């Protein structure tokens, strides 16, 4: 998959998980954050997004929330960080 095909690559994990390593170029929008839907509302609802977490569960939940909010672009569940890294060919980096 070409990472350039997505408006954003979104990591929906906790801040601690993000700090332990995330995809280069990803943005963090933690699904457990109180302002998660407010963060999503800042995005282009017609664009394509690649979403990942630790196992794919929270990414799936985030995709459902995005669909309920009216997102119409392609929403891809990348599963885990390692799987997403492999699929997109992006390194895992730390802050």
Stretches found by the model and what they are:
Residues 52:
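Short, surface-exposed ligand- or partner-binding patches at beta-edge/loop junctions that are enriched
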Residues 3-7, 15-48, 57-95:
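Rhodanese-like catalytic fold shared by cysteine-dependent sulfurtransferases
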